A protein has these predicted regions:
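Short coil-to-helix segment of the ABC ATPase nucleotide-binding domain corresponding to the Q-loop/switch region
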Residues: 135-142
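Signature (C-motif/LSGGQ) region and adjacent switch/coupling loops
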Residues: 110, 118, 138, 164, ...
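Helix-to-loop junction immediately C-terminal to a conserved catalytic motif
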Residues: 89
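Conserved ABC transporter NBD signature motif
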Residues: 2, 7, 97-105
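Conserved ABC ATPase signature
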Residues: 175-179, 183
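ABC ATPase NBD coupling module
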Residues: 48-52, 106-122, 147, 152
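Conserved ABC ATPase "signature" region
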Residues: 38-47, 102-105, 142, 146, ...
């Protein structure tokens, strides 16, 4: 069975990092920087909340995802999985730390660079998602391309590629209400 795996352990050690998260902290509250010494000193989440009115979302997260490698973020409800993922595309600003994608510092990106990054490199399916109910699957998939003013023929080709890739071939003309929840999320 080992021969079926695409990457050996050695391959992963020498491959280039796709995503690096270094010493990432997120504290929610009115003065996150003001409590960082306490957080670095090891204060508990409960004590930080009860005595200082701040919520510790992430504490010293370090992750390296090599190219062509899949990592799974698992944890209990409320453990910070979504908070962590939202830092990669900077939907949430960290209290401290570093996020690199293709060795580019996501936190240093300008608004224009960040917008392009989100369009081309960092997609995300939200836990609670919204589809346009009056548009078909094809129209929903192509909506972002339409907004970007991609020519209609190219947009349709690209949309069909992704519809095929996620296993919705044959449902292009269906509306969201005609799909199962799992199909809608795809």
């Amino acid at each position: 069975m080992a021969g079926d795996f695409k990457h050996t352990e050695r391959d992963l050690l020498v491959s280039k990092s796709k995503i690096q998260i270094k010493s990432l902290f997120k504290v929610f509250g009115n003065n996150p920087q003001g409590v960082m010494d306490l957080v670095n000193g090891g204060i508990s989440k409960q004590e930080l909340l009860e005595n200082h009115g701040h919520v510790l979302g992430l504490r010293d997260i370090n992750i390296d995802v090599p190219e062509k490698c899949i990592r799974v973020i698992m944890g209990l409800s409320g453990s910070g999985k979504s908070t962590l993922i939202r830092h990669i595309n900077r939907l949430i600003e960290p209290t401290s730390g570093q996020v690199l994608v293709d060795e580019e510092d996501v936190l240093a990106m300008s608004d224009v660079e960040l917008k392009n990054f989100r369009r081309s490199k960092a997609s995300m399916v939200f836990q609670k998602f919204a589809l346009l109910p009056h548009r078909t699957v094809m129209e929903n998939v192509g909506y972002g391309l339409q907004i970007q003013k991609i020519p209609e023929a190219e947009a349709k080709t690209r949309s069909q590629h992704w519809i095929d890739r996620v296993g919705l071939t044959g449902f292009e003309d269906h509306y969201p209400a005609q799909l199962s929840g799992g199909m809608q999320q795809r």
